[in-house]
Amino acid sequence: MFQTSRSQLLYLSALGVWGLWGYAYFNGMFTRLDTITRTLHFPDNRPLRDSYTGLGPLDKQLTLLSVFYDVLTNSLSSGPRLLFFDINYAVACTNLWTLIESRRRGVRSWFLKYPAWAMVLCNANGAAIVLPIYLYCVCRSKARLRDPVVPLHEAVALPIITVVMLLQPLLIFAPAWFGYSGSETHHALIALFQVAPVIVLGLYVGITSLLSYHFPATSLSSKEYKKWISASLILAGSVASAVHIYTLTGALFTRDSDVSLTRLFVPTGGFTDPIKTLVSNENLLAEYAALLENLHLFSQWDWIVVCLTSVVYAQLLLSRREGLKVNKPAVPYEAQEMIYLTIATVVLGPGGAGSFALAIREARI
C-alpha cells in the first residue's frame, strides 16, 4: 500500500528543479531571458523597465522577474495566462498554510517562525522548488507536538491577512484587464508583487500587536483559536477552488485551442527549443512565441509539483505522522484519504483541496 513520507517532499523539490530549470538549460529559455534583460526590449520590441529601487543588484533581479511575469500575465496569450492565474491562487493558499504553522506556540526556529523569505523565494525561483523544502521542514518540526496552540490575537488576525493574500495576485493580472498590459506600471506592480510577502507579514505583525490588547493571552481558548484558523483556510480554499473551477470550465467549453485541457496542463517538448517546432502564428513573432512556450512549460511543471506537494503535505498532517522519526504503518482510512485528496485536487485544485483538508486537520489537533 502506498504511504506518504516527508522525504517525498524532497524528491518533489528535486523534480521541481529539473522541471523548472533543467529543461530551461536545454530549450533556450536562459538565452532568451539574457537577451531581453541585456537589450531591455522584448522580442516584439516592447520596452522593459530596468529601474525600481536604485539598488543595482536588486533591480537586476527585479528586471529578470519582470520579463517572466510580463509574458505570462499580459494580454498577448490566453492559455498560459489562465494557468498562471490558477497557480498563483494555489500558491497564495500555501502561503497561508506556512503562516499558520509559523504561529504555533511550539515553533522555536526563526527559520520557520518568519516564513516571508520562503514566500519571496517561491515567487522568485519557483514554488515547485522552494515549497516542498519548506513544507518538509514544517513536517520535520516537533512544534505541533510541543504546543500546537496559536495565540488568540494571532488567530483572529488570520482572516484579515487571508483577504490581503488573496488580493496579491491581482497586482500582476489586473493591468492586462484594464489595458495597462506590458506597461511600466505593469512592471512596477510585478516588482511590488515580489516583495509583497514581506509587506504582508509586516502588516500581520502590526495587526496582531493591536489585537493583543483586546485578546490577552490569558483569554486563550483551544476551541476559540481553531475557529479563526478554520475560517481562514475555508475562505482561501473557496477562492482558490473557484479560480480552478473557472480554469477547468474555460478549458472544457472553449473553442480556443490555446485554452484546451492538454494545452494548459500537459507539458510538451522539454529539451527541444520550441522555435524549431512552432506552428506559424500571425499574431506573435516567432521568438516571442518561443519564449512564451518556454515559460509556459515552466508553469506546467510548477503546477504539477505544487499539486503533488499539496497532496503529500495534507496527507502527512491528516495522518498525524508529521514530526515523527518513524512513520507508522498506513491504515485503510489513510488510503481512502489519499484517494479523496487526489480527486479533490483534480476538481478543486491544490489550493482548495489542501486548504479544506487542513481545516479538517485543525479539528483533529
UniProtKB/Swiss-Prot annotation:
GO molecular function: isomerase activity
Annotated TM spans: 10-30, 82-102, 116-136, 158-178, 188-208, 233-253, 297-317, 338-358
Keywords for this protein: Isomerase, Membrane, Transmembrane, Transmembrane helix
Subcellular location: Membrane
Keyword set includes Ion transport: no
Pathway participation: Polyketide biosynthesis
Domain of life: Eukaryota
Topology within the bilayer: Multi-pass membrane protein
Assigned EC number: 5.4.99.-
Family designation: Belongs to the membrane-bound ascI terpene cyclase family.
Known role: Part of the gene cluster that mediates the biosynthesis of depudecin, a highly oxidized eleven-carbon linear polyketide that acts as a histone deacetylase (HDAC) inhibitor and makes a small contribution to pathogenesis. The reducing polyketide synthase DEP5 is the central enzyme in depudecin biosynthesis by yielding the backbone polyketide chain. The monooxygenases DEP2 and DEP4, as well as the uncharacterized protein DEP1, then act as tailoring enzymes to modify the intermediate polyketide chain into depudecin.
Protein's UniProt name: Terpene cyclase DEP1
Classification lineage: Eukaryota, Fungi, Dikarya, Ascomycota, Pezizomycotina
Gene: DEP1
